[in-house]
Amino acid sequence: MAKKIIKLSFLIILVPLAVILGVVVFKDRSYAWVSLCVALFSLVPLFLTFEKKDTNTTKLVILAVMIALSVAGRFLFSFIPHFKPVTAMVVITGIYMGYEYGFICGAFTALISNFIFGQGPWTPFQMFAWGLIGLLAGLLAKVLQKNIIILLVFGALAGVLFSFLMDVWTTFWYDGTINFSRFIANIVTAIPVTIT
C-alpha cells in the first residue's frame, strides 16, 4: 500500500507541480526541461514496480507497442480535424496494464509524437493530460471492464478532460497568469472541438 501511495504521489503531485512550476518560473522558455521532468517523474512508478519484480520484458514490449501505436495513430489521422485515437489507446493501456503503464503511455505518446508535430510549451500539459487519463483508466479498470456503457462515458469524459487541461495551458499562454474569465472564455470557445 505504501508503494502505491508513493507511485500515485509522483504522478498526481510531482508531475502537475513540475508543469505548474515550469509555467510560472520559466514561462515558455524552458519547456524542454519541464517535459524531461514530467517524463522522468512518470517513470519512477515503473522503476518501483521493477523493484518488486512485477514487471517483465513482455510488459515493457507491450507498453512500447502501445506507445508506438498511439504515436502512429496520431500521425496517420492528423489530416482529420479533431480526431486522434491517442486517448483510446491510453485508456486501453491503463485498463489492461495498470495505472503506471497508462500514465507512461499517455505522457510518452505526447512527448514522442510532438517530435513530428512540434515540441512547445504545450507539450508538458499534453503529457500530463494524457498521462492523467491513463492513470484514471487504470485506477477505474475493474469498473470500466465490467460495463461497456460506463467505458464509453469514461472515454467521452476523458476527451473533455484533455480539452479542459489544454485550456488551462491556453489561459497561461496568453500572459503567464490564470484569469478565470479568460479560462471560461477558452472553454466556451473550445466547445466545438471538445464535443467532436
Where does each model-flagged region fall?
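Membrane-embedded alpha-helical hairpins and interfacial helices in multi-pass inner-membrane proteins
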Residues: A2-V38, T123-A129, L135, L139-T196
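Hydrophobic transmembrane alpha-helices
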Residues: A2-V91
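Transmembrane helix interruption/hinge and helix-loop junction motifs
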Residues: F26-S30, M97-G102, G118-G120
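Generic transmembrane alpha-helix motif of multi-pass integral membrane proteins
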Residues: V44-L48, V86-G102, L136-L140
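Membrane-helix interface segments
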Residues: N56-K59, Y99-I104, L144-I149
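Alpha-helical transmembrane segments in multi-pass membrane proteins
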Residues: V65-S70, G94, G98, C105, ...
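Interfacial aromatic-anchored transmembrane helix boundaries in multi-pass membrane proteins
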Residues: V71-T87, A107-A141
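Membrane-interface starts of transmembrane alpha-helices
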Residues: H82, V86, Y101, K146-F154
